Amino acid sequence: TPEEFLECCRVFQENGIDTPIGANRWWLETFVFAQAYADLYNGGTTEAEIAALNSGEAKYSDYMRPGFQFLQTLIDEGYVDAEKALVSEAIEGEGPDFLAGKTPIVMAYWGAANSETAYGKTDFEMQVVGFPSSRGQMPVIPITGWGVGANADHLEDALEVINVITSDEALQLYSETNRVISPSKNVKVDCVPSLRPLNNRIEEGVYVLGSNAGMKVEQWGNTCRIVRELLGGATVEQCMESFDRLQ
């Protein structure tokens, strides 16, 4: 939960780790999504809640506020270095301290479980877990999609290529080679040990989406941009006003 996560950070700091969370300007919105949408995606009322957001009956700011308040607490307590995060690229900003053991917590995509392709080879074991939420550790899943232009010169060829790339056979090969979390219900794979805590939650059907084409307000990019406003000194309520303007 958020409270348990804050307690972990407090203990880290008491034991000499000044900044427990390595952050950058791209990925802090993951904390927000986990808290904002834990109930929306896992409470059995997903369609109705999204319809209310799209119609304006409900406000995105009401969903986002707890996550932004949580980020503000991380900043105020010194668990995140806001000034550094605001100017840091993904992995480059926090990577060296993570490898050196100075920063125990970082945000990363699942592929970072194979850390040699992300942070570099580690001399410690790591675990990939979900983000803190009212429902416990929460996987945040950004959707990656494929698209073909309707007027493409080689439309049929392009569609055929996508069909091959996204086939069960291709996804099985990809998953087995990289030992990552399965991208398809039709593909079973033994992921690397560090991913198992996250994989277990996903197999239980517990997760939130970081992107959703069914929402009229684009999620990932807009939230990332407004998080940067917070890192730059805006108040939580000023950030909520930014969401209200989008809606």
Label every model-predicted segment.
Residues 39, 43, 77-80, 151-158:
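Short helix-loop capping/hinge motifs at secondary-structure junctions, enriched
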Residues 2-6, 84-99:
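Short helix-initiation/N-cap motifs at beta->coil->alpha
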Residues 4-56, 103:
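Extracytoplasmic/periplasmic solute-binding protein
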Residues 104-109:
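Paired acidic/hydrophobic, glycine-rich loop segments that form the ligand-binding mouth/hinge
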Residues 40-66, 118-120, 130-139, 196, ...:
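Short, solvent-exposed loop/beta-turn-alpha elements that line the ligand-binding surface or hinge
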Residues 9-11, 53-85:
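Glycine-centered hinge/linker elements that transmit conformational signals in sensory
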Residues 117-180:
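Extracytoplasmic/periplasmic substrate-recognition and gating elements
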Residues 16, 201-247:
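Conserved C-terminal helix/tail region of periplasmic/extracytoplasmic solute-binding proteins
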